[in-house]
Amino acid sequence: MNNLTAIVLAGGQSSRMGQDKALITVQGVPLLQFVCNIAASCAEIVYIVTPWPERYEHLVLPRCQFIPEAGTQGPLIGFAQGLAQVKSEWVLLLACDLPKLRVEVLQEWAANLDSVPEEAIATLPHHAKGWEPLCGFYRRRCSPPLLEFIHQGGRSFQQWLQHHSVQVLALPTPEILFNCNTPEDLAVIQGEFDDLSPNPSPTRRGA
């Protein structure tokens, strides 16, 4: 665990959701707290990169430190700001809106980091639209080329990753990458968790 630091990005505008996604509760737990608790089970230190640390100070966030983000400039710049504080070889990068994230999957991925080829700067899930940059692992040495890309005006994770070697992370199930971006997404995830909750008494027909 000492060789892994986690960065959680909580700097999005949440415009499609209409409220701060990080504070939306699923099964009574704010999403940011849920993601950070999982990150803390895999990493010694968890950095939360956000322009609004005061919004989240009341949450239960073990082993977490805030990195104030200079405005909402997008996830790539937020990652670069967090990466500047990292001392470990590997960093786990997570978005704050992953309600189906599973700790055992991240721990298994982390346990296999030693087998990632030396030339790879990251190991990430891959899907039809490209890499999933906000749920995976990066080597700290990706910082110089990342900063160069940003200084040249780059803001896209996908465009940056095209220029580097990245190893594919095997997904046990694609649903762990589910993002809670809209009220419809929230309704879906809350409905699924409600279905999993035990019902102490059967519902009467016609009630």
UniProtKB/Swiss-Prot annotation:
GTP binds at residues 9-11, 21, 97. InterPro entries: MobA-like_NTP_Trfase, Molybde_CF_guanTrfase, Nucleotide-diphossugar_trans. Pfam families: NTP_transf_3. GO terms for biological process: Mo-molybdopterin cofactor biosynthetic process. Keywords: Cytoplasm, GTP-binding, Magnesium, Metal-binding, Molybdenum cofactor biosynthesis, Nucleotide-binding, Transferase. The N-terminal domain determines nucleotide recognition and specific binding, while the C-terminal domain determines the specific binding to the target protein. NCBIfam families: PRK02726.1. Transfers a GMP moiety from GTP to Mo-molybdopterin (Mo-MPT) cofactor (Moco or molybdenum cofactor) to form Mo-molybdopterin guanine dinucleotide (Mo-MGD) cofactor. This is Probable molybdenum cofactor guanylyltransferase.
